[in-house]
């Protein structure tokens, strides 16, 4: 909200608001997580001012509620995101995504020789956090990658 208390992105009556997405990541989330695979209205705010992040993206999806598992998968790209479930214009539940143990069917293995790139199988990674760094290990080629290596491949 701005200092004159006007909303920059219209409020929704019912649905999900994904807030505190790092700037320039909103479109990537929409694509990777197939958030546009609905006929419901989706509102996107890009490069909005944020006291916490400086700039942020925001996604509002009407009449759709993300599960806790779906929210946690967002933490790979947007570790500071919050997922708010809205009903009658009020936040009825706030999810703070945490890194999942596994992520399937979303990311692409950076190993060009991995079978997940050429065979009809869903990619699958185990997620490990060590010393503040996130590493993803491919189920198929068993190679481990830093989070940024997997994210840049997308």
UniProtKB/Swiss-Prot annotation:
* Residues given in the record as Zn(2+) binding sites: 109, 114, 138, 141
Query: Which cofactors must be present for this protein to function?
Result: Zn(2+)
- Mind listing the UniProt keywords for this protein, alphabetically? Metal-binding, Pyrimidine biosynthesis, Zinc
> Its domain of life?
Bacteria
GO MF annotations in UniProt:
metal ion binding
Q: Which GO terms describe its cellular component?
A: aspartate carbamoyltransferase complex
Annotated GO biological process: 'de novo' pyrimidine nucleobase biosynthetic process; pyrimidine nucleotide biosynthetic process
Subunit-structure text: Contains catalytic and regulatory chains.
Please give the NCBIfam families that the UniProt record associates with this protein: ATCase_reg
Entry protein name? Aspartate carbamoyltransferase regulatory chain
Lineage in the entry?
Bacteria, Pseudomonadati, Pseudomonadota, Gammaproteobacteria, Enterobacterales
């Amino acid at each position: 909200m701005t200092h004159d208390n006007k909303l920059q992105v219209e409020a929704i009556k019912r649905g999900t608001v994904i807030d505190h997405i790092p700037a320039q990541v909103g479109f990537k989330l929409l694509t990777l997580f197939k958030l546009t695979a609905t006929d419901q209205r989706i509102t996107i705010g890009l490069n909005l001012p944020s006291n916490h992040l400086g700039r942020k993206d925001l996604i509002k999806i009407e009449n759709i509620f993300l599960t806790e598992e779906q929210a946690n998968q967002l933490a790979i790209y947007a570790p500071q995101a919050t997922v708010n479930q809205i009903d009658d214009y009020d936040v009825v539940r706030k999810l703070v995504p945490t890194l999942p143990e596994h992520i399937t069917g979303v990311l692409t293995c950076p190993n060009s020789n991995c079978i997940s790139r050429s065979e009809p199988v869903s990619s699958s990674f185990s997620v490990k956090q060590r010393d503040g760094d996130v590493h993803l290990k491919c189920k198929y080629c068993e190679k481990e990658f830093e989070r940024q290596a997997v994210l840049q491949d997308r």
